[in-house]
């Protein structure tokens, strides 16, 4: 995936630090009052520095500013425990497990101001 291809994706938000592109978050669909995040990528050389946590916190806050958004969902593969740990730390809870070639979890976070 090139930066040009990322820029062409709908509802794709660039993550930058000090003017440098370091990752992206993409909202892929809205179902009723739920927004589903489809992609969340951080440059692997920059993980473990809190940048992904900060970016996701800002993105969550931005989504919940819209009073019609009551929840946010995403999927995470079982073989990505660091991502699952990040989402859990940010208040996402596993709501479904999908078995398959690669086991994954559907996780959801509710807007605490509403619920």
Task: Give the location of each predicted region.
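Conserved acetyl-CoA-binding loop of GNAT-fold acetyltransferases
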Residues: 88-98
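Conserved GNAT acetyl-CoA-binding A-motif
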Residues: 65-75
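Acetyl-CoA-dependent GNAT
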Residues: 1-45, 62, 66, 111
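Terminal substrate-recognition subdomain of acyl/acetyltransferases
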Residues: 105-115
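Conserved acetyl-CoA-binding loop-helix of GNAT-fold acetyltransferases
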Residues: 42, 48-62, 85-89
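Methionine-biased hydrophobic packing positions in alpha-helices, especially
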Residues: 56, 92, 107-108
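Conserved beta-strand-loop-alpha-helix junction that forms the acyl-donor binding cleft
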Residues: 74-84, 100-104
């Amino acid at each position: 995936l090139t930066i040009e291809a990322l820029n062409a994706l709908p509802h794709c938000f660039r993550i930058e630090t000090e003017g440098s592109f370091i990752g992206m978050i993409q909202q892929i669909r809205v179902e009723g009052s739920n927004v589903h995040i489809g992609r969340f990528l951080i440059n692997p050389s920059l993980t473990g520095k809190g940048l992904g946590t900060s970016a996701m916190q800002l993105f969550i806050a931005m989504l919940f500013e819209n009073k019609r958004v009551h929840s946010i969902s995403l999927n995470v593969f079982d073989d990505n425990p660091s991502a699952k740990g990040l989402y859990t730390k940010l208040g996402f809870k596993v709501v479904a497990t999908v078995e398959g070639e690669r086991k994954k979890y559907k996780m959801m976070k509710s807007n605490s101001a509403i619920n």
